[in-house]
A protein has these predicted regions:
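C-terminal active-site "lid" helix and adjoining low-complexity regulatory extension at the edge
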Residues: 120-124, 133-168
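Active-site nucleotide/adenylate-binding loops and adjacent lid/helix of ATP-dependent enzymes
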Residues: 1-74, 101, 105-113, 166-168
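Histidine/lysine/aspartate-rich catalytic loop segments that bind and position anionic ligands
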Residues: 75-94
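Short, surface-exposed beta-strand-loop junctions and turns on beta-sheet-rich folds
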Residues: 71-72, 80-82, 148-149
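Hydrophobic residue at the +6 position relative to the catalytic HRD Asp in the kinase catalytic loop
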Residues: 129-131
Length: 168
């Protein structure tokens, strides 16, 4: 990408999709939550016309790092918390039994810096960056930078403390 940050490979039209992409994620909406509008396809012929296509990158794990003014204020890892009948096991969201948890998760310094850089590049003071880690390539990839992450519990307290600290 233009900023030099590691994102999953992406494009905006079907015609741009490289032949070597074995699985393609189609994102029907760029504004949403919980995986709304995401479908995964194995051939370009069955693709809907959408705003964004990405290569499906296999993940060892997924995490969310919350950044405020250039520093991490919270971090979570996505865990399967309940079994449900999944339509597509490649999509990890609340509907398929996956949620962000703390579980004493300590993020890798590389992922923290990538999240800091992502928030800075998009020009935000704060944001929650969703990342995946691929063990085979020993690589983190940015999935998205959330400008209005769901805030509750400890995460909400961490944001409140960050904002109060910034005012003092």
């Amino acid at each position: 990408n233009e900023a030099g940050l590691a994102t999953v490979p992406w494009c905006e039209t079907k015609e741009e999709i490289p032949n070597e992409w074995k699985q393609i994620v189609a994102r029907a909406t760029l504004v949403g939550h919980s995986g709304a509008g995401i479908t995964i396809h194995t051939t370009p012929t069955d693709l809907p016309t959408v705003s964004l296509y990405t290569k499906y990158v296999k993940k060892t794990y997924e995490c969310r790092i919350h950044i405020f003014k250039g520093r991490m204020i919270d971090a979570q890892i996505k865990r399967k918390v309940r079994d449900v009948e999944e339509n597509n096991p490649l999509i990890r969201n609340i509907h398929t039994g996956w949620v962000y948890c703390r579980d004493n998760y300590i993020p890798d310094p590389t992922s923290i810096q990538l999240a800091i850089d992502a928030v800075r590049v998009v020009g935000l003071d704060f944001g929650a960056v969703d990342l995946i880690y691929n063990q085979h390539y020993n690589q983190f990839y940015i999935l998205e930078c959330n400008t209005a992450p769901g805030l509750e519990g400890t995460t909400l307290i961490n944001y409140v403390n960050a904002f109060i600290g910034d005012l003092n």
